[in-house]
């Protein structure tokens, strides 16, 4: 759902007014323990155009190339964090793509590489995101990305989706030079919001991020859009659902 600017401005203004009233009432009544939501990127960002672009450019090979690319994206991030050799997610994503092309024996020209990387700057939000974010704001909840994405990558999604004004400052892992699930990354939410861990919901997309957030101490909601299996890491999310409407219900339950 891409809101036109007039409709969005009206909804956002209403949400801020309602937030001021409702947040005070909720705290006074002791109804909800939550005061903010920190989002991983992908509960908000729809990554499917990347897969579509891969198949368009490399028919019959797109799925294999994409699988290797995604795996190496996160493995490279984790390895760089463990080794103290941080590079931002844009660089990690490009390096992972180059490896994936070699591993799948696909000849990737510089122009093709650039076109695939550009897809990340063209991504938009999932259709259920805009109304859900307005509902969360109206319930008095503060919102921010806490993501491995760079700030320019997050800014692009917000522009592409017409979501200006809903999120606070981006908490990109670039700020601490450590990718999730490093505790330094999750700590950004506590520091930025100025709240206790138990007052901040972490909205995760991947099972490993559920585990990382739970280990850190956040109440964690798994936005399991792909119906993925839970990881065997000894933790269970506090809530789970297929979309942001489920997160809204969890965050605003009395």
Task: Show which residues each predicted segment covers.
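Active-site neighborhood of HAD-like aspartate-dependent phosphohydrolases
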Residues: 30-71
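Boundary at the C-terminal end of the N-terminal hydrophobic targeting segment
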Residues: 24-28
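Short, acidic loop-to-helix structural element flanking the phosphoryl-transfer center
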Residues: 90-91, 108-144, 155
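Glycine-rich phosphate-binding loop signature in dinucleotide/nucleotide-binding domains
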Residues: 31, 139-141, 193-196
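Asp-based, Mg2+/Mn2+-dependent phosphohydrolase catalytic module
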Residues: 3, 7, 39, 134, ...
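An amphipathic alpha-helix signature
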Residues: 51, 66, 70, 90, ...
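A metal-dependent, Asp-based hydrolase signature
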Residues: 77-114
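N-terminal secretory signal peptides and thylakoid transit peptides that target proteins
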Residues: 1-16
């Amino acid at each position: 759902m891409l809101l036109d600017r007039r409709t969005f401005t009206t909804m956002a203004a209403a949400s801020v007014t309602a937030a001021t009233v409702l947040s005070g009432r909720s705290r006074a009544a002791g109804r909800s323990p939550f005061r903010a939501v920190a989002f991983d990127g992908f509960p908000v960002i729809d990554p499917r155009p990347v897969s579509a672009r891969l198949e368009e450019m490399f028919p019959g090979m797109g799925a294999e190339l994409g699988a290797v690319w995604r795996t190496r994206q996160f493995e490279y991030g984790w390895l760089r964090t463990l080794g103290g050799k941080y590079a931002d997610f844009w660089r990690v994503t490009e390096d992972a793509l180059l490896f994936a092309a070699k591993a799948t024996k696909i000849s990737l020209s510089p122009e093709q590489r650039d076109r695939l990387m550009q897809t990340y700057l063209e991504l938009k939000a999932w259709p259920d995101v805009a109304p859900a974010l307005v509902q969360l704001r109206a319930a008095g909840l503060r919102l921010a990305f806490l993501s491995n994405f760079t700030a320019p990558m997050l800014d692009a999604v917000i522009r592409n989706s017409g979501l200006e004004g809903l999120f606070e400052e981006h908490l990109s892992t670039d700020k601490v030079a450590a990718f999730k699930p490093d505790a330094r990354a999750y700590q950004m939410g506590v520091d930025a919001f100025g709240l206790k861990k138990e007052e901040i919901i972490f909205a995760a997309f991947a099972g490993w991020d559920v585990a990382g957030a739970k280990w850190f101490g956040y109440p964690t909601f798994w936005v399991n859009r792909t119906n993925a299996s839970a990881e065997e890491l000894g933790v269970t999310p506090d809530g789970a659902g297929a979309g942001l409407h489920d997160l809204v219900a969890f965050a605003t339950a009395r």
